[in-house]
Amino acid sequence: MEQLFRPASEPTDRLVLYFNGWALSPIAVEHLGLPEGQDLLLLWDYRTDALDFDFSPYREIRLVAWSMGIWAADRFFAKHEELRSRVVSGTALAGTGYQVDDAVGIPEAFFHKTLEGLTEENRERFDRHMLGGKTYRHLYEEVRERSTEALYDEFIRPFTVDRDQPRPLPKPAAFGLWSKAFIGEDDRVVPPTNQENYWRIQG
């Protein structure tokens, strides 16, 4: 994973841990304010799980994750159980803990269609479709900096990792992490009904 650390103006034992969405960098959330008295660790690029960061100073962790970041956060805390008790709140945005699933994630047919469209020849059209119009021009320019291969590898990784694994509901790796989930009514990637299905069962 890639990381960006922004310390508070004074030393603190509270951390906002933010898992970004697929393909995105810190520019996607740089306009948001950070609560006073809290450090921020922003993570993105989930082609690997590797993370070099010292969590020992923090007594409280406020977890926030966007889309694929929810899957990445579940995976991270499953490998770092010692941190789970420090999570005081968890906010999930526009996604679920199972990245590819016909009932509670991205429908598999849509997932494969997206992969097929993610080619060097189709890259500009793909980026514009994914990021919308001029309102998100700054995101478009930032995403263009990443190679097509990198985006492809990041997008396919959850499917590759989870393909032959059981997907129980509720998801054990997510227990105790999430206190709120926000679902976009017009989400074109993870259908709102699938998100509702997941969070209704996950609780």
Residue spans for each PLM region:
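Active-site catalytic motif of lipid deacylating hydrolases and related acyltransferases
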Residues: 1-59, 110-111
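The conserved beta1-alpha1 loop
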Residues: 17-21, 66, 183-184
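Short alpha-helix in the alpha/beta-hydrolase fold that links the catalytic acid
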Residues: 30-31, 177, 191-200
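Gly/Ala-rich beta-loop-alpha elbow adjacent to hydrolase catalytic centers
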Residues: 64-73
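Flexible "cap/lid" loop of the alpha/beta hydrolase fold
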Residues: 82-117, 154-163
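Helix-rich cap/lid subdomain of alpha/beta-hydrolase
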Residues: 99-142
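Hydrophobic, aromatic-rich cap/lid helix
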Residues: 140-169
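Short beta-strand/loop motif that positions the catalytic acidic residue
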Residues: 175, 181-183, 187
